[in-house]
């Protein structure tokens, strides 16, 4: 397949590496246009992939079979809209990012839209991307009109396993959102690795109760206890990890809070549900952000 990967950060480089190794024709797409992108990745087994790949070639984009978007949630909408007119109208766009809310911003996109969520973990260490842990990627249609692209899951399964297709991806996205609503803001506020959160079961339960109430009103059956058990499982499995939000805070970057707890707040408001704990966490992270964005270092640029 011919694939353009939009966003060449940790997750983007992970996919570029895996696609390249499987013989797919790939290019990166960067915010600052340049003819190549450097991919420098250390795999979970210690092997190294270090290549310069094509980037920002509009002819390549115009003949791509898939646009894989691995940007931060707040960058997605503007970036995808800027490329949509060059991309064939039949080429699916697969979004893989933390949080929810980008689909609502892309309702008028003509191309088929797919949403994904992944438990693969990768982080930056200087100029190198470390593939910290293998995981599973869930993908499915973002809107009712987006149809069956399960063949893509089969192809991507051979690239970076595991990949699972869901006709109803929304339920999976909400489960991941519950995890993100707990782990991301708490680690960002307390400046700690994920594993430290084990010591705060009451706080975690409080957040899960609020998230479960919203999920139920969204039409997906769950319980606060189920969400809590799942969150604790993820905390244990990723105990050593530094969450993406804490990485953003430490490097004075704009976080994805608007698409995590912020998205939950918007849906809660729509259903008339009070979510005081999530509101408090949202405001605390926004306050941290504003401390450095006020002096201009972490201002959200266009993607």
UniProtKB/Swiss-Prot annotation:
Substrate binds at residues 98, 180, 184, 194, 244. It is an enzyme of class 1 (oxidoreductase). GO terms for cellular component: cytoplasm. It comes from the Bacteria. Pathway: Cofactor biosynthesis; (R)-pantothenate biosynthesis; (R)-pantoate from 3-methyl-2-oxobutanoate: step 2/2. InterPro entries: 6-PGluconate_DH-like_C_sf, 6PGD_dom2, ApbA, Ketopantoate_reductase, KPA_reductase, KPR_N, NAD(P)-bd_dom_sf. NADP(+) binds at residues 7-12, 98, 122, 256. Its EC number is 1.1.1.169. It is found in: Cytoplasm. One of its GO terms (molecular function) is NADP binding. The active site is at residue 176. The keyword NADP applies. Belongs to the ketopantoate reductase family. PANTHER family: 2-DEHYDROPANTOATE 2-REDUCTASE, 2-DEHYDROPANTOATE 2-REDUCTASE-RELATED. Catalyzes the NADPH-dependent reduction of ketopantoate into pantoic acid. Monomer. This is 2-dehydropantoate 2-reductase. It comes from Escherichia coli O157:H7. The gene is panE.
């Amino acid at each position: 397949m011919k694939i353009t990967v939009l966003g060449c950060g940790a997750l983007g480089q992970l996919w570029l590496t895996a696609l390249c190794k499987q013989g797919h024709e790939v290019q990166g797409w960067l915010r600052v246009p340049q003819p190549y992108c450097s991919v420098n990745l250390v795999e979970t087994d210690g092997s190294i992939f270090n290549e310069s790949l094509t980037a920002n070639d509009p002819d390549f984009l115009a003949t791509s079979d898939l646009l894989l978007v691995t940007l931060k949630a707040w960058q997605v909408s503007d970036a995808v809209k800027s490329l949509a007119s060059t991309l064939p109208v039949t080429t699916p766009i697969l979004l893989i990012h933390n949080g929810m809310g980008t689909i609502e911003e892309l309702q008028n996109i003509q191309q088929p839209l797919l949403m994904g969520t992944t438990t693969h973990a990768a982080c930056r260490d200087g100029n190198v991307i470390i593939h910290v842990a293998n995981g599973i990627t869930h993908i499915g249609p973002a809107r009712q009109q987006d149809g069956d692209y399960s063949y893509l899951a089969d192809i991507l399964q051979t690239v970076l396993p595991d990949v699972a297709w869901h006709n109803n991806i929304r339920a999976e996205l909400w489960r991941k959102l519950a995890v993100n609503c707990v782990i991301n803001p708490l680690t960002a506020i307390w400046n700690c690795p994920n594993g430290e959160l084990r010591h705060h079961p009451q706080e975690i339960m409080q957040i899960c109760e609020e998230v479960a109430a919203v999920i139920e009103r969204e039409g997906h059956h769950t319980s606060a206890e189920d969400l809590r058990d799942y969150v604790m499982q993820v905390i244990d499995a990723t105990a050593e990890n530094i969450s993406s939000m804490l990485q953003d805070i430490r490097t004075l970057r704009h976080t994805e809070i608007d698409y995590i707890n912020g998205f939950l707040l918007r849906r809660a408001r729509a259903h008339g549900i009070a979510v005081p704990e999530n509101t408090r966490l949202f405001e605390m992270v926004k306050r941290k952000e504003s401390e450095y964005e006020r002096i201009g270092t972490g201002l959200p640029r266009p993607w």
